[in-house]
Amino acid sequence: MDGIFISYRRDDSAGYAGRLYDRLAAHFGAERVFMDVEGIEPGLDFVDAIEEAVSSCRVLIAVIGDEWTNAADAAGRRRLDDPNDFIRLETGAALKRGIRVVPVLVGGAVMPLAADLPEELKALTRRQAIEINHKQWEASTGELIRTLESILKTPPVATAAGNQPSADPGVAKVSAVSGSMAGNAAATHGNSRRWALPA
């Protein structure tokens, strides 16, 4: 249970998230770094699937760009106000389970205010953030890597729900999320590992 889960919005920080994946995978190994929960076998509960995927990791990186808080859907509704928003589900699952959440600010973004977040995400505003940028990529991501190294070498704690996280590496949990999903529904992002969820 030593995986790193990268949570991000495609229309907000996809460029940063993809580059960050490559940097972390090169340092920690591709089998320990995951990004995207975007598809799941028909008939499975996607909320449960996201919680299982997140719980297989030791730390969740919340990549926050300047549209992370106010991004809207096609109808103009703020995505964070949707209980089924993937970012809300991913981050909320990590906070609920006591998984370490590291906010990573990109593109000049600032931390959201608690008043602007749904109840289950308000604790995110109390997490110390790291800022990364393309101009100082090696230095800023180096700080993040040192933080992750410190987290991953620390023994895991019991989750808020009283359940002990799985000891298996995150890569083994792809199949736990959706049975045979790893074999027939995985998507790719460069060399990234992704859980595929139906659109």
Q: Model regions: which residues?
A:
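Conserved N-terminal substructure of TIR/SEFIR domains
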Residues: 1-77, 83-87, 91-99, 107, ...
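Short, conserved catalytic or adaptor-binding loops enriched in Gly and charged residues
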Residues: 26, 116-126
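Extended interaction regions within the primary functional domain
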Residues: 61, 104, 117
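A cross-family acyltransferase "interaction/gating" segment
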Residues: 108-111, 115-118
